[in-house]
Amino acid sequence: IAAKQLTGKPLVVHMHATSYDRASDDQVDTRVVDLETKGMMAADKVMAVSELTRNICINRYGIDPDKVVAVHNAVDFSGREKLEVERNVKEKVVTFLGRVTYQKGPEYFIEAAAKVLKRCNNVRFVMAGSGDMLNRCIRHVARLGISDRFHFTGFLRGKEVHKMFALSDVYVMPSISEPFGISPLEAMQTNVPSIISKQSGCAEILSYALKVDF
C-alpha cells in the first residue's frame, strides 16, 4: 500500500489463501482479517487462485466483484524426468502429502484409512508432512489400531516429494478448505490418480479427479 502511495503505480494483490481457509469461523484471527481486507480494498486488482477464493474475497471481505479475477495455478509438465523407484512393499500405497494442520483435513484421511482397512488389508497409508496436528494424528492412528498399516514420513521436499508420488497408487487431498491445491497436479505428473475435496480450487479444473465432501 505504501509503495502504491509513494509511486502512484497500480497495486495488484495475489490472494493465495485467506484467514477463512486456515481456521474455522470461531478461530479466525480478526487482526489478520483486517490486514487482508485493508490490502484488498487498496488494490486496483485482486488475483485469486480460484473461483472459490474469489467468492470468499467478495462475500467475506466485501471486495468489489469487478476487480477480483480468478487465475488458476499450474505446474510445468515439460522437462520432468521420470523417476525409477524401487517398491519394497507389495501392497497398494495411498498417500496424503501436505501440512498436517486443521485446514488440510488429516484426521479425515486417518478415519478413511481405518474404514478401508476393515474391508481390505492389501493397502498401506502414508501421511507425508509436518504441522501442529502431527502428534495428535499419530495418537489417533494408534487409538484406531492401524499403526502397522499407517506410516508417517515427516516433512518432505524437492525430489523426496516426487519420489513419494512415484511410490503412490492413489493420492488423497481431504482439505476442509483449499484455495487451490497444487499437489493433485503434481500427482498427475507421475500418473497418480487423485481423490480431492470438493472444497478446493483445483476441483474447478480437474474434471477427471474423484471429488468428495470432507
PLM regions: where:
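Carbohydrate-associated surface elements
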Residues: 52, 74
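Nucleotide-sugar donor phosphate/pyrophosphate-binding loop at the beta->alpha transition
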Residues: 7-12, 20-38, 58, 77
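Short alpha-helical donor nucleotide-sugar binding micro-motif in glycosyltransferases
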Residues: 155-156, 163-168
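Short hydrophobic beta-strand element within catalytic cores of glycosyltransferases
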Residues: 193-196
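Conserved donor-binding/catalytic core segment of Leloir-type glycosyltransferases
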Residues: 47, 88-113, 126
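Aromatic "clamp/platform" in nucleotide-sugar-dependent glycosyltransferases that forms part
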Residues: 176
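Nucleotide-activated donor-binding/catalytic signature segment of Leloir-type glycosyltransferases, i.e.
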Residues: 138-156
